[in-house]
Amino acid sequence: FKSGAVHQAVHLRGCKFASGAYIMSPALEGAFTMIMGHHSFHHDTSAFPYSYLVEKEGRSVLMPGANLTSYGAVRDIEKWPARDRRTIRRDVINFEEYNPYITSGMLRAVDTLHAIAEEDPDAPTYVHQKAIIRAAALKRGIGLYNRFIVAALGAMLDRGESAERYDGSGRWLDIAGQYITKREVEAILDAIDHGELASPEEVDNRFRVFSVHYDDYAHSWAEGVYASLLGHIPTVAEIEEAIAAGRNARATMRRTTDADRDRDCSLDMAVSYGLDSDDEGEVRDDYYSVRGLK
């Protein structure tokens, strides 16, 4: 505060804080990061979505991609659209799990993790933007991200259509809940500057038009990424293979998160339930009833 009380911390979409979590501003976390403990070294983990950021021995320790194995993340993603009961939807909000914004972040995360490891392949730990990454967590993160990328590309290729007028290439942004290309945002700003969009309603309509064709733009982006990975424009058969691979990857990820849910809902967690019960069966029934498990 010596230079003024302007300390900004940004927690990107889906970040969640455990009880007692504390972050000293400025700081920045990647989308869908789970934060536990106290963090006062002004970290920047924006390059690593779906991570755990935990405090160990007073330091910030990052586990890249670890939140991809948590049923808590799945529950959040599924409950938000279910709880969106707006009768008048003034804001365009995209709840899609597999989207260009997050997936492009994971592509960059894989490159970043490889680059970090190559600096010292035998190091037990690494430090990146004030956060410690253990070698085992780094290696695991690459695998988790790659699986999500396969799942996401398949999902996006399975939606929308290929059309030149829906060019989704380039960088994507999360603008107040809407996934949209940076190119389109800049085009809207230019149209405002030139007087082509003269009212809030006209600006809003431009964002809504993009939203209507979101699946087509996302399909275009995914097809471009897939082409760069293959080194050529994918054939119809290769697109179908990518879609099938995506389904398999999503099924594998879901089995992992369901197993996490089962552990969290095991009878080991039934302590304190059924206080007036006479046997373990009644305790179990009370536990299942309260938790909504059966």
What do these predicted ranges mean?
Residues 1-118:
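Glycine-rich hexapeptide-repeat left-handed beta-helix
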Residues 83-215, 219:
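Long, charge-rich C-terminal accessory regions
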Residues 182-294:
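C-terminal amphipathic alpha-helical interaction region
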